Amino acid sequence: MSTPGQRLCGIIALMKATMAIFPRAFLVVSASLAPLLAQTPGSQQQQPEFIRQGQQLMREGKLDDALALYRRTLEASPNSLAAHIAAGSVLDLQGRGEEGRKYFARGIEVADTPEHKAMAQRAMAMSYAFERNCKKTVEYEQQVFDIYGSEKNFFQQGEIADEAARVCIESGDLDSAYHWYQLGHDTGLKEPAIKPARQDLWEFRWEHAQARIAARRGNQAEAQKHIAAAKNVFGKGTNPEQAQFLPYLQGYVAFYAGDYQAALVELLKANQNDPFIQCMIGQTYQKLGEKDKAFEYYSKASTAIAHNPAAAYAVPLARKNLTLLPS
């Protein structure tokens, strides 16, 4: 029988594995669990064996084996939140979202704290993201947003709103994306005694989002205005870790302007381990008629094992496009 500390570490380890490509998504989760871990000294050193084994199997591309492992775990421990989230995540990666959501629903039922329930609800939201279903993603992200609102945790509310917006923009629902990005910006700035660097972070993200939305709407002048504003905020030097998101932004805007050569130059400067970037590079090469390079990048994106907006966009699209490319 696992201890509460082991169960908590299992959940954290799972979220690290499934959200590794998009680090700020994991930070939201780990922050909410920190007080609980503080109540179980030494538990940080423990990690259930099924989580370690499952992570390794997924890295090796053995999703069926990982799923079987998580199901065996649930036979022995039917209330394991980590195992429910893990099993559902694997099913989403396999394109079996309807099955996966049964595990997330059960995770919501067995969650023993609001924070744990938020984790399961967030996983459910991401399940719908794999199907580009903005409406259902928002339905569950709203519940997570409200939980953090009850705690007056404005930063995490902002993170959740931005996550919902990211799903909506790539689902093609630009009005919803704008609403949630604006909500994330405005809510994040409510943080008491907010530091200038944090303010700049929210301004950078908001300009970044507005540029992408304008590009998707075909308004290049507006997109370029917001790119300039984002560069301005970044130029303050308060958030150097955001550097990788500028070439992503410029490549994204160029892609939707139809300037695929410029898009490629910028996207190749962005985070090459991000499945979203890998997929966009594949799309760009495909537009340029370079099928072999497109195949290479789609292949990379298709093997992502994260459970976040980046993978939710990349994995289904990359796999679909791989089947359409001439052999």
Residues covered by each model-derived region:
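Short coil turns that delineate tetratricopeptide repeat
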Residues: 44, 78, 112-115, 149, ...
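Start-of-helix register in tetratricopeptide repeats
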Residues: 48, 82, 116-119, 159, ...
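Alpha-helical segment of the N-proximal tetratricopeptide repeat
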Residues: 46-72, 76, 253
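Residue-level recognition of tetratricopeptide repeat
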Residues: 55, 89, 126, 166, ...
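Canonical tetratricopeptide repeat
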Residues: 86, 119-123, 156, 163, ...
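Canonical positions in the second alpha-helix
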Residues: 72-73, 106-110, 144, 184, ...
